[in-house]
Structure formats: structure tokens, C-alpha cells
């Protein structure tokens, strides 16, 4: 895992619903915790692009549903600023299910993957067809 160069807006708090962008069998995920989050009292933990979160599978195959799994956020609707000054935003909030070490469980990723997530997680960048 590599550090992020951009200022990522943490726009996906606990309870946020994400699209599962891989072929593991999950369709919709709900954020239940953000790994390594140190926040203030009474503030909801939130994550952004490139962060590892723990999710609960809300929709998908019967084997996948109701499981708590680690995932990496690869897209977010809220725009964020890159180091060169450009602003980036995507059509949806999406994540891919991974192992605790960060290697994806699926064999393909649907849709674009943010450059920040691809740089930080080499396993995700290997499966990404489009890096934006």
C-alpha cells in the first residue's frame, strides 16, 4: 500500500451504499467501518477513493449476502482535487472486494478505476481495464 498524493475528500461515511464493481457475486455493499480511521468524537468514520473499508453485502448471490468483507473504494461521486490541480469525479460510488492484504477476490473490474486507487493498490491496478 502506497500513500496518496492527492487530497481525497472522505465523502462515504458509515452506512453509505456502494456498487460492487467486480465479479464476486455481490451487487450492492454498505460501508460499516473504515480501516485506520482516526477521527473526532461523534464524527462518523468516512472513506474516499483508495481507502480500505469494511462492507456488508446487501444485494447479491445467496452465498455472498450478509457477509462482512474488506473492500477498496475505486470511484466516488464527490469530486476531489489532484496534485496537478485537476478535479475528478465519477458517475457512481463503487468498490471492489479484496482480501485483508489488498488482493482482489474477483477476476475482473467493471468500469473505470481512479488513478489514486490504482497507484495505492497494485492488485487492483492489475485487473483494471480503464484507469482514469
UniProtKB/Swiss-Prot annotation:
<dbReference type="InterPro" id="IPR036853">
    <property type="entry name" value="Ribosomal_uL14_sf"/>
</dbReference>
<dbReference type="GO" id="GO:0070180">
    <property type="term" value="F:large ribosomal subunit rRNA binding"/>
</dbReference>
<comment type="similarity">
    <text>Belongs to the universal ribosomal protein uL14 family.</text>
</comment>
<keyword id="KW-0699">rRNA-binding</keyword>
<comment type="function">
    <text>Binds to 23S rRNA. Forms part of two intersubunit bridges in the 70S ribosome.</text>
</comment>
<dbReference type="GO" id="GO:0003735">
    <property type="term" value="F:structural constituent of ribosome"/>
</dbReference>
<dbReference type="GO" id="GO:0006412">
    <property type="term" value="P:translation"/>
</dbReference>
<dbReference type="InterPro" id="IPR000218">
    <property type="entry name" value="Ribosomal_uL14"/>
</dbReference>
<keyword id="KW-0689">Ribosomal protein</keyword>
<protein>
    <recommendedName>
        <fullName>Large ribosomal subunit protein uL14</fullName>
    </recommendedName>
</protein>
<dbReference type="InterPro" id="IPR019971">
    <property type="entry name" value="Ribosomal_uL14_arc"/>
</dbReference>
<dbReference type="GO" id="GO:0022625">
    <property type="term" value="C:cytosolic large ribosomal subunit"/>
</dbReference>
<dbReference type="Pfam" id="PF00238">
    <property type="entry name" value="Ribosomal_L14"/>
</dbReference>
<dbReference type="InterPro" id="IPR019972">
    <property type="entry name" value="Ribosomal_uL14_CS"/>
</dbReference>
<comment type="subunit">
    <text>Part of the 50S ribosomal subunit. Forms a cluster with proteins L3 and L24e, part of which may contact the 16S rRNA in 2 intersubunit bridges.</text>
</comment>
<keyword id="KW-0687">Ribonucleoprotein</keyword>
<keyword id="KW-0694">RNA-binding</keyword>
Amino acid at each position: 500500500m502506497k500513500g496518496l498524493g492527492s487530497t481525497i475528500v472522505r465523502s462515504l461515511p458509515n452506512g453509505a451504499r456502494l456498487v460492487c464493481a467486480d465479479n464476486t457475486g455481490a451487487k450492492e455493499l454498505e460501508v460499516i467501518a473504515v480501516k485506520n480511521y482516526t477521527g473526532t468524537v461523534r464524527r462518523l468514520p468516512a472513506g474516499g477513493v483508495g481507502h480500505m473499508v469494511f462492507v456488508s453485502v446487501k444485494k447479491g448471490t445467496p452465498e455472498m449476502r450478509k457477509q462482512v468483507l474488506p473492500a477498496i473504494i475505486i470511484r466516488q461521486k464527490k469530486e476531489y482535487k489532484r496534485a496537478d490541480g485537476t478535479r475528478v469525479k465519477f458517475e457512481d460510488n463503487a468498490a471492489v472486494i479484496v482480501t485483508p492484504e489488498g488482493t482482489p477476490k474477483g477476476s475482473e473490474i467493471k468500469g473505470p478505476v481512479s488513478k489514486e486507487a490504482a497507484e495505492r493498490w497494485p492488485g487492483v491496478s492489475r485487473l483494471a481495464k480503464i484507469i482514469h
